[in-house]
Amino acid sequence: MASKLWQSTATGSLHPLVEAYTVGDDQVLDQHLLGHDITATKAHAHMLKKIGVLTSDEYQQLAAALDELLNEWKTGTFTLTSEHEDGHTAIELYLTEKLGPIGKKVHTGRSRNDQALVMMRLFIKAELEAVAEKLEAVAQAYAGKIATIGQTEMPGYTHTQKAMPTTVSMWLGSYHDAFHDLRQLVAHSIAAIDQNPLGSAAGFGVTLPLDRQMTTRELGFAKVQENPMYCGLSRGVFELIAVQALNPIMVFAGKFAEDMLLFTSQEFNYFKLPVTMTTGSSIMPHKRNYDVFEIMRATAHAYPNYTLQLQAISTGAGSGYHRDLQLTKKITMDAFTSALNTLEVLALCVSELEANTKRLAEAMTDELYTVAKINELVEKGVPFRDAYQQVKQSFLADSH
């Protein structure tokens, strides 16, 4: 069998430079995604048995071979090679080499278009669910730290200047609430993309009586993505929806990183991490550098590039399939890797956070209480603006 599903003796071999350029790093990416591709292939084969394309014995052989392939993939004994154009090709070649003509039947009623769509859809669902779990872990880390150091007073800041008194609990609690709430955004994204594209084939459906409801149930999707052209139209866009849900997560992670870089500086010295979580200098032996927060801040700043790339590529491709969309795979995978790694590190940093209660107490200086003094005068019947001016004049006089 030819190493490419579309190849024949009449077409000859693809120029190696063109092949390398068009395939790109698909083999590396598909190696990671192969489990989802195998799962969807098994569901498709089961459906083919139901509609009579496969006999019961043929399906059993295919299912056993797919289970064997899945196990080989999980244990690392099956890897994609240069002879595989992509993971879809690798699966069919594996089945054909193992089962002969039976393996050649597995692609009936299916295109690599919907095969790639369902593989990525399963991946995105799983990754969003993993993000939701990480968000809960981060929220719990904040809650745990609030329970131990939350009652400590600290200055609140506006314009990076001391403003009003607050507590560590209120500061950390704001991040707890943020990450807790973002689980709802992730849930909405899952609901939006939880549609089964398998059976749309090349984007126009097929004349076979495919049971798409059956594969929807077997793969755990909420519903069938009915219009086959919409299946193709949503490629890249559903990825965009998912990655956009990660943007606010990275915004809050970046904000916390910025807070920590300020509050751990020697000038503030409010908080610290264990020495095992900081780095040093090759020339200055006294340095304790919070590289982890600098990388987190930079990662958060760069993160919108993922959504910009997905939107640009998806917008530039009209309806129907275009090879441009292949590039959305790596962007999406990298976006999830970045967000999940950030959340994992963030949970660790929060759980290991230590407060310098002595320094925080010293920082609770008189100017933080000016609004409280105004309110005391207001409660005595002084109009607010008059009370404001009295307190301001008194503060300015004392500061000179």
Q: What do these predicted ranges mean?
A:
Residues A2-A40, K98-I102, M284-H400:
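Glycine-rich cofactor/substrate-binding loops
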Residues L219-T307:
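Acidic, glycine-rich loop-and-beta core segments that form the ion-binding/anion-interacting portion
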Residues K125-A132, E136, A143, S169, ...:
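Short amphipathic alpha-helical segments with heptad-repeat character
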Residues L14, G144, T148, T152, ...:
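Acidic-glycine-rich active-site phosphate/pyrophosphate-binding loop
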Residues M1-G205, L210-T216, T276-S281, D291-I295, ...:
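A helix-coil-helix interface module used to build multimeric assemblies
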